[in-house]
Amino acid sequence: ETTKIFSLFYKVQDYFKSYMDTSSLLSLEFRRFIQEGKYKKNQIAYFDRNSNKATIQNKKIDITNYTQDVISALYACRTIPNEEIIINDTIFIQVYNLEKKEMFNTYFVPIKKEKIKTKLFGEINTIKCHPHVQKNRIFSDKDETYIWVTDDQYHVPVKVETPIQVGSIYIEIIDAENINYKF
């Protein structure tokens, strides 16, 4: 969501909800509510894991056993064991694109281990990752998105930086409640 001042020029309120199987972390349902300037769109995708089909607005497409939505993909990546994360190695993920109603293959690359300072956690050891982000109305064609995750078994995303069509987005966790995690 954009700040009040920025909203005077270009309001962005995008909400994503992912319902997933808690053991496999595979998508069962994905909801996307978009407001970007004057553009508005609400979409829901249902994933039938028994028939390997995804449905959106009565259109069915084939999916694989490993197809994710953008949120469940992040959770699935967090389960990769530390010993399988190799700096500069490419990790591939298949994601369902609601807007185009199709599958696309994407990837991310762990670039380096880095100690960063955050408002909530202070100095923390992280792995800086470079995910491939598809160009759209918000994201520019510059492939310069970075995500920092904790360098531990949990891989908590603590910071994101990405260029957009009209500037850049910086995301950082500034508060957390009811978590059982020691940084």
List the model feature ranges, each with a label.
Residues 1-47, 85-183:
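Acidic, serine/threonine-rich low-complexity disordered tracts
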Residues 38-84:
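Hydrophobic, well-structured mid-protein blocks that either form specific transmembrane helices
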